[in-house]
């Protein structure tokens, strides 16, 4: 096994036939593995893996065989992943471009983090390398499948080994949960409950009706690096003031002040839109730890920690309706992007929220999964981009997959 990065490995030699017992399945698992693959390009490879694994006594869930016609919906896939002890991710150049495959990867990562077990087995095809993978998958042990399938025993060994926790991949410990709970109780729980009222008051006084969402925009740069001001992102973004200050006695600090900033952003037509927005400041700690070698936090581990932070914060907010509908997390890739990318992203988010607010539509976020954190429901670490996605971006043979604002998937069949 050749080491490739801090915790990523590629198998480059065949493993001789192994004698191993088949693990006993316990509730809720009814399969040893769910096999995720791109149906348009990789079915034959996936079926060869299926035959090899099941010939050794393992039970797999394989969509082409086990799902009824018309049954391959997002809900069915989520249930199948949850009922599987492991997920074998067959990853090829095609699957990295497939919205359905990226959805399955995201659901597998989410389920793995929920149970805190490293139960994902990335199998790489077609020259895919670790650095090509979505960031949350890069710390995992990867298997580079040989053209003659001689090393399928590596896959069998991977799904047979004792379970590891995610903490075993994170030398600095689990930062994410503490950061998320601290951010919620120490900040969001204080400023969000009445935020929509103060925003409505500000936009009425400042003649911003129809050009400002009621939500607080929380910006989440992929690098976790937070600038001093959002206006530093582009000359099209300007500081315009702040909402009324909230004063609260807190942790020995008398009359501690909480202040939320208002910005404007200019769209392609030269019209100004307004938003209350800020970076999720706590994640900047991870960026600073990454820069300091003594902390032991490396870039790939930072990606895992940041996703765990997001998922934990999402679950916390989902239990608090008073807060969850009053903020919008906006994830974006902040490296090698043009200067007008951020303003376009913000304008699109504001206009999307205004449409929802004007129609009182809070049920479905009609932005596909290839968007950069379109709502507090679906981070796509597979291909983060500032490009504003639309239904025309979806490949015809792929499903339109959407999530509700609550985070639940909406069942949409493959097209």
From Swiss-Prot:
Domain TIR: residue ranges: 29-163
UniProt region (Disordered), positions on chain: 387-415
Biased composition range(s): Basic and acidic residues: 401-415
GO MF term (any one): NAD+ nucleosidase activity, cyclic ADP-ribose generating
BP-aspect Gene Ontology terms: activation of innate immune response; autophagosome assembly; innate immune response; positive regulation of macroautophagy; positive regulation of type I interferon production; reticulophagy; signal transduction
Enzyme Commission number(s) of this protein: 3.2.2.6
GO CC terms, sorted: autophagosome; endoplasmic reticulum membrane
UniProt keyword annotations, A-Z: Autophagy, Hydrolase, Immunity, NAD, Nucleotide-binding
InterPro entries recorded: STING (IPR029158), STING_C_chordates (IPR047191), STING_C_sf (IPR038623), STING_LBD (IPR055432), TIR_dom (IPR000157), Toll_tir_struct_dom_sf (IPR035897)
Catalyzed reactions: NAD(+) + H2O = ADP-D-ribose + nicotinamide + H(+)
CDD domains xref list: STING_C_metazoan-like
Keyword Hydrolase (UniProt): yes
Active-site residues, as the UniProt record annotates them: 104
Binding site for 2',3'-cGAMP: 256
Subunit structure: Homodimer.
Family to which the UniProt record says this protein belongs: In the N-terminal section; belongs to the Toll-like receptor family.
Record's function text: Sensor of cytosolic DNA from bacteria and viruses that promotes autophagy. Binds c-di-AMP, 2'3'-cGAMP, 3'3'-cGAMP and to a lesser extent c-di-GMP. Nucleotide binding has not been seen to stimulate NAD(+) hydrolase activity.
Domain notes: Homodimerizes by swapping the N-terminal TIR and C-terminal nucleotide-binding domains. Ligand binding induces lid closure and repositions the TIR domain. The TIR domain mediates NAD(+) hydrolase (NADase) activity. Self-association of TIR domains is required for NADase activity.
Protein name as annotated: Stimulator of interferon genes protein
Source organism phylogeny: Eukaryota, Metazoa, Spiralia, Lophotrochozoa, Mollusca
């Amino acid at each position: 096994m050749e080491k490739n990065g801090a915790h990523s490995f590629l198998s480059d030699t065949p493993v001789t036939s192994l004698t191993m017992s088949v693990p006993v399945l316990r509730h809720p698992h009814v399969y040893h593995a769910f096999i995720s693959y791109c149906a348009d390009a990789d079915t034959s490879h996936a079926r060869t893996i299926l035959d090899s694994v099941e010939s050794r006594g393992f039970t797999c869930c394989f969509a082409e065989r086990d799902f009824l016609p018309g049954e391959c919906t997002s809900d069915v896939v989520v249930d199948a992943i949850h009922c599987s002890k492991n997920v074998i991710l067959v990853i090829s150049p095609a699957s990295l471009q497939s919205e359905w495959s990226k959805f399955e990867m995201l659901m597998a990562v989410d389920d793995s983090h929920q149970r805190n077990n490293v139960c994902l087995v990335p199998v790489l095809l077609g020259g895919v390398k670790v650095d090509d993978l979505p960031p949350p998958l890069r710390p995992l042990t990867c298997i580079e499948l040989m053209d003659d399938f001689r090393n399928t025993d590596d896959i069998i060994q991977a799904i047979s080994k004792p379970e590891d926790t995610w903490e075993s991949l994170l030398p600095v410990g689990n930062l994410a949960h503490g950061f998320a709970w601290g951010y919620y109780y120490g900040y969001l729980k204080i400023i969000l409950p009445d935020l929509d009222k103060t925003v409505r008051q500000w936009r009425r006084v400042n003649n911003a009706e129809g050009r400002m969402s009621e939500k607080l925009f929380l910006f989440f740069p992929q690098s976790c690096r937070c600038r001093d001001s959002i206006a530093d992102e582009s000359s099209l973004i300007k500081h315009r003031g702040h909402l009324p200050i909230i004063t609260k006695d807190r942790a020995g600090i008398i009359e501690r002040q909480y202040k939320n900033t208002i910005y404007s952003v200019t769209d392609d037509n030269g019209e100004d839109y307004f938003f209350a927005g800020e970076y999720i400041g706590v994640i900047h700690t991870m960026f600073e730890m990454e820069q300091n070698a003594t902390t032991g936090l490396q870039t790939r581990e930072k990606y895992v920690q940041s996703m765990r932070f997001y998922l934990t914060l999402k679950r916390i907010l989902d239990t608090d309706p008073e807060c969850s509908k009053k903020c919008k997390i906006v994830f974006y890739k902040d490296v090698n992007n043009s200067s007008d990318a951020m303003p376009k992203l913000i304008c699109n988010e504001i206009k999307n929220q205004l449409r929802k607010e004007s129609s009182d539509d809070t049920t479905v976020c009609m932005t596909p999964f290839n968007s950069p954190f379109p709502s507090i429901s679906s981070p796509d670490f597979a291909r983060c981009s500032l490009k504003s996605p639309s239904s025309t971006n979806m490949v015809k043979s792929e499903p339109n997959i959407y999530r509700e604002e609550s985070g639940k998937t909406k069942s949409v069949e493959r097209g």
